[in-house]
């Protein structure tokens, strides 16, 4: 079976030589893409990058990584190496907030306005609960990390999806509890005490449950993935 891959930079497709993508739970992922690009194309290698993959036998491809290029390094006259962070890394900047009688919707709306990010919030009571005040004195990451306690959200987490939208809420209200996965041990390429290596699964992301364990990390390169776990 053939694994199809597609890399877009600012809406333009580039030939992909190799990739190394790492996704994490509650923090932005990182990626390095080596692409076919001449010296004349170098100036265009800025902005948003989107990486999709899918097996040839399946219908369509799945967006696996959406991020921003931090820098592009020349490999030779025909290739560039792109160092990228997941789009949620836009929160890694000073975004002061001071909102009285704030709801989680208010907080996420303020962060969206400051970063251009799009947040997904489940229709649950904690989305509209008002806190006396919400103060964010540091980065957007700090504000999101505090939100779970401030608004009383059990098993709180936030996670960037493949399309760049960011889920914020209880893990129980995310897509994962109703979609547990199982892979027989014989299909693991390699196995350790806290990680497993498997053939690429385009929909696999941190937060998913595989064989009764919650995934905390997914690292993809070539045709395989390494997933790191915690017990559910």
Question: Where do the model's predicted regions map?
Answer:
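Assembly/oligomerization scaffold segments
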Residues: 1-89, 198, 213, 217-232
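Short beta-strand/loop turn elements enriched in aromatics
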Residues: 2-28, 112-117, 163-189
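Amphipathic, non-transmembrane alpha-helical segments in extracytoplasmic/periplasmic proteins
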Residues: 33, 99-119, 135-160, 207
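Short solvent-exposed loop/turn micro-motifs enriched in small/polar/acidic residues
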Residues: 44, 62, 150-152, 203
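Noncatalytic linker/hinge segments flanking ATPase motor cores
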Residues: 75-76, 107-114, 122-129, 161-163, ...
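Short beta-strand-centered interaction patches in the first periplasmic/extracellular domains
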Residues: 79-80, 84-87, 123-193
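Short acidic, glycine/Ser/Thr-rich loop/turn "cap" segments at secondary-structure junctions
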Residues: 89-102, 126-132
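Surface-exposed, non-catalytic interaction/assembly patches
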Residues: 93-102, 169-209
């Amino acid at each position: 079976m053939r694994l199809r891959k597609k890399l877009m930079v600012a809406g333009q497709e580039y030939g992909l030589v190799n990739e190394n993508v790492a996704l994490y739970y509650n923090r932005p992922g990182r990626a390095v893409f080596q692409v076919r690009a001449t010296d004349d194309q170098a100036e265009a290698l800025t902005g948003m990058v989107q990486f999709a993959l899918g097996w040839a036998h399946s219908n369509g491809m799945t967006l696996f990584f959406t991020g921003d290029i931090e820098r592009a390094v020349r490999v030779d006259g025909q290739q560039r190496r792109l160092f990228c962070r997941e789009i949620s890394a836009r929160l890694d900047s000073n975004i002061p907030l001071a909102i009285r009688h704030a709801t989680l919707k208010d907080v996420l709306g303020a962060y969206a306005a400051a970063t251009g990010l799009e947040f997904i919030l489940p229709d649950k009571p904690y989305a509209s609960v008002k806190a006396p005040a919400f103060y964010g004195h540091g980065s957007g990451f700090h504000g999101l990390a505090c939100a779970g306690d401030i608004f009383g959200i059990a098993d709180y987490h936030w996670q960037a999806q493949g399309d760049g939208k960011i889920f914020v809420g209880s893990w129980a209200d995310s897509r994962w509890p109703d979609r547990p996965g199982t892979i027989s041990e014989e299909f693991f390429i390699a196995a350790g005490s806290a990680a497993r290596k498997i053939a690429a699964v385009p929909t696999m992301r941190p937060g998913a449950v595989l064989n009764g364990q919650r995934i905390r990390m997914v690292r993809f390169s070539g045709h395989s993935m390494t997933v790191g776990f915690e017990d559910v």
